[in-house]
Amino acid sequence: AHDIAAELWEQGAKNVTMIQRSPTTVTRSSTLLDLQTIGNFSEQAVQSGITVDIADLIVASNHYKTVHLDGQKSVQLLKNIDKEFYQKLASSGFLFDFGEDESGLSIKYLRRGSGYYIDVGGSELIINGDINLESPAEIDEFTEKSIFLNNGKEIDCDLVVFATGYGSMNQWAAKLISQEIADKVGKCWGLGSGTRKDPGPWEGELRNMWKPTNQTSLWFHGGNLAQARHYSKYLALQLKARYEELPINIYGIPVVNHLS
C-alpha cells in the first residue's frame, strides 16, 4: 500500500489517501540494513573468513523457538536509533506495532508473512502529509464517484486500489492445482507460534517449506533472498536424490493441523 501510494504521489496524483485497517510493523530500510550488516554479514566478518555460505548456515542454525528473543533485542535498538521517526509516525495517526511480543518485523515475517512494511520513503510522505491517512478505517460503501468509510467520512475518488495483504502459498496451490490438494498439504509458512495468523501447535520449522509434503512430488520453495539462497541447495539435494533413486530416510511428513 505504501509503495502504491508513494508512486501515485510521485507521478502527480492529487489527494492520495491511504486507508489503514490495522497496525503495521514498520522498519526503516536504512536501519534494517545497518542492523543486518552487524556481525556475520559485515565486512569485518568477511575479512575474518566468514563467507556468505557460512553466514547463512549460522543464521539457519538458530533455533526458531528462541529467535524471537533476538528480535526483541533488535526492536530495542530500533526504538533508540529511530526514536524521532517513530514519534513523528505516531503523531501522523499511523498505527504501528513491533509484533505481538515486541519481536519485530523479521519474526512477524516468519510467523505470518504479512503485516509489515520496510520503509523506503512512504512513511515520510505520510508524516509530511503528502499522503493523506484514514486510520483506523474500513470502506463501508462505494458510490459512482466516492467511498464511504465506517468512520462516517466520504472521500471523492477517481481510483481505488485494493492493497489488502499477501496471499498464502496454499491459496495459490488451490488456484493452480486444486482445493483438494491444497487441503491435503495444509497450511504453508508460519511456525505455529500461536500468534495472530500463525495458529498452533508449535511446528519447529516453517510449515511445508523445502521438504516433502503430504502430496507426492509437490514441493514449496519461497522466502526472501537469503532463504532462497540457502535452502534451495537442500531442496535441490532432495530432488536429486529422488531422481537418482537413492534410499532416503525422512524424519516425518508434516501433520496437517490447518487447512489451506
Regions found by a protein language model. Give the residues of each.
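Flavin (primarily FAD) cofactor-binding/catalytic cores of flavoenzymes
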Residues: 6-22, 29, 64-260
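Residues forming the Rossmann-fold NAD(P)(H) cofactor-binding site
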Residues: 2
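A catalytic-pocket lid/entrance helix-loop region that shapes and gates access to the active site
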Residues: 25-69
